[in-house]
Amino acid sequence: MAKIIVVSTDCPYPANHGGRLDILMRLELLSSTGHDVDLIVTYKEEIDEASKQYLERICKNVYYAQRLGMIRSAFNDMLKFLPLQVKSRSRLREIKLNKKYDYVLCESEYVYSILKNSTLDAKNKLLRVHNDEVVYYKALFNDENSIFKKIYYFYEMLAFKYNKKDINSSFDKLLFISKDECDKESKGIWLPSHIPVMHPFKYDKFDLHNCNVLFVGNLFMPNNLQGLIWYLNKVHPMVIKENPDIKLTIAGNAKNGISEELKKAISIYDGNAINLITSPSDEELQAIYDGNCIFINPMLNGAGVKLKNLDAMRNTMFVVSTSIGSEGTGTNHGEQLVIANDEVLFAKHIINYSKNISGMKEIAFNAFSFIQENYDSKKVFSSIFKEN
């Protein structure tokens, strides 16, 4: 079996947003199939002991590298026009490694600095491409209201564009989450997220919770926030006017607290109408999925595959999404989900399907089956390892 070192942009546990989920599922897959897996975690905030213990159970060795703050990152390597996301992880160069690896798997361009580590000895270099970073930061720039943050996003967009060719050429293979982006790259391999179905399809919950609507996603990124605020301001008033029994739960990582704009959007509703759950654990998140039926993804801007839809589908959810929210997943309107790009149609789907339990079950089951059949990375990794 292969010796692999995975370099993560963040602590992947708890997996309370899509990027973490993608990394954690891959770690668990590689470990469970008998590979010798080491892990480097780059982090901003201190990692709790429970998270460390979980990662140490599935990985042979776990290394930790604290990220530099924004100001220190800006002054680090000032003569190099590198993204601050890369500069902030420059301590990857200093970690002392003492093994020879068959593969180093970098979870995004952010951890590119590990290739500058003189103690890294890896035969093959793999890059997991989570997003087209240029498109991603352009979308964040468009969604952001703060001038300071807009400047930051604009800088990152330009820096990733400037360095893209050099970074990509440093790797032997590029493992794309998006099939569309993969097709544009000669070194590309499509590696769909490993999203194994952990529980059987839960038919009964549609009879019990047909009026319960759920949003799960990190609550600090502008594209999530703007989509959610659009839903709260434009869509949900129409939904509860038609059906006052419908309840909304918002759950997600809130590492920077709740934005004032989101608080304001929530405040227009009665106290019991919206349930806000910040930074749920994996166990809490499972209970949240089990107590809701209709999952919403109202993203209006963004790049890459939105794993929140796929995670919802494997957890027996009926998904209502914008086109942006569903892109790159291979799912189709009316088969695995329903799509709406304006507030009237978005509200109409929620209202109508909350009354059409059999229709909701059928689409949710199609989505559940789709995840079972298409989102297993074992075959792709097997073919990669056979080539080398």
UniProtKB/Swiss-Prot annotation:
Per the record, the domain of life is Bacteria
Q: Which SUPFAM superfamilies match?
A: UDP-Glycosyltransferase/glycogen phosphorylase
The family database entries (Gene3D superfamilies) matched by this protein are listed as: Glycogen Phosphorylase B (3.40.50.2000)
Pfam families referenced in this protein's UniProt entry, alphabetically: Glyco_trans_1_4
Name this polypeptide is given: Uncharacterized 44.6 kDa protein in cps region
Which species expresses this protein natively? Klebsiella pneumoniae
